[in-house]
Amino acid sequence: MHSLARGHVVVTGGAGLIGSAVIWALNVRGIDDILVVDRLDTSEKWKNLVPLRYRDYLDADEFENRILTRASSFANISTVFHLGACSSTTEADAAYLMRNNYEYTKHLAHWAVDHGIRFVYASSAATYGGLERDLRDDADLDTLRPLNMYAYSKHRFDLYARDHGLLSRIAGLKYFNVFGPNEHHKAEMRSLVDKAFHQIRETGAIQLFKSHRTEYKDGEQQRDFIYVKDAVEVTLHIAEHDANGLFNIGSGTAHTWLDLVRPIFRAMNVPERIEFIDMPATLRDKYQYCTCASIDRLRASGYDAPVTPLADAVDDYVRNYLIPDRRLDPAQAPAGVK
């Protein structure tokens, strides 16, 4: 079993949603010997770092340069959580995505494996492309067809890791629909919970896409939602148990958009008002009506903790973070829903 308390921990993308939540969970465990790696641009994601405890910060490009030219300067690093990437599914600059999401990950993975460092990286559920329902992390990677350049950049590294003998020595995590505190900087890429909260506060209502398939009623399109607090507990489990290969990080259950938004109204103590609008014609042929992670491999790795019920997770997020405008703070709450 790998000890996260032994040696330094590196978290790339450490100011982002999942990265900052990983640091929070480590802090709750009493671990703060952490190097945060990120690109603090003009967004407000730096605010996610304010309550957290960590040893040092490095710009992502400087970190890459050092591991390529002065790897010896990083003595005693035992664990790397590589969670930094451009995660915009609408990013059109393919060269940027391949450089940032593919080449960068290759450099980090080889460096970590060569130096005996535990390496856990973020793949993505987007790599499954247009597949629906029971999405399996043991599927033949050659059969997957990503639908956007972001997903392809992630899938390309999964293929590289497999073909170069890395995937049996590292862990790739296919995060599904992660939501929770510390995501507001993501703008249009943030979860519907965050978007709906602000929409309800401003207008008293939330808009959802109508269904354009007869087997699904409006609002009953389904997704596998997972609370960020659960996602990071799974992430730490994978790192500690030396479980290698690809793992789906989801709840294993599909819920409807209505299941997601109704608890928001209750937590805000406002009447439920849901309006259904036409889906843009450009999305209709690409829209997935049901995604659900198979988590058999995760359970086989020994992770047996229950997933926070969706309504409880939404309630915790809205009441304890969105309404008071708080971020994850190890001084205020232990890991888990409180």
Roles of regions detected by a PLM:
Residues 12, 37, 80-84, 119-125, ...:
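SDR active-site strand-loop-helix element
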Residues 9-29:
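N-terminal Rossmann NAD(P)H-binding glycine-rich loop of SDR-like oxidoreductase domains
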Residues 81-84, 94-102, 106, 110, ...:
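Catalytic Tyr-X3-Lys loop
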Residues 51, 60-100, 129:
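NAD(P)H-binding glycine-rich loop region in Rossmannoid oxidoreductase-like domains
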Residues 99, 103-107, 114, 118, ...:
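Catalytic helix-loop patch of NAD(P)-dependent Rossmann-fold dehydrogenases
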Residues 200-338:
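C-terminal substrate-binding subdomain of Rossmann-fold SDR/epimerase-dehydratase oxidoreductases
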Residues 147, 176-190, 197, 210-228:
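Glycine-rich "substrate-gating" loop/helix at the edge of Rossmann-like oxidoreductase active sites
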Residues 35-63:
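Glycine-rich phosphate-binding loop and adjoining beta1-alpha1-beta2 segment
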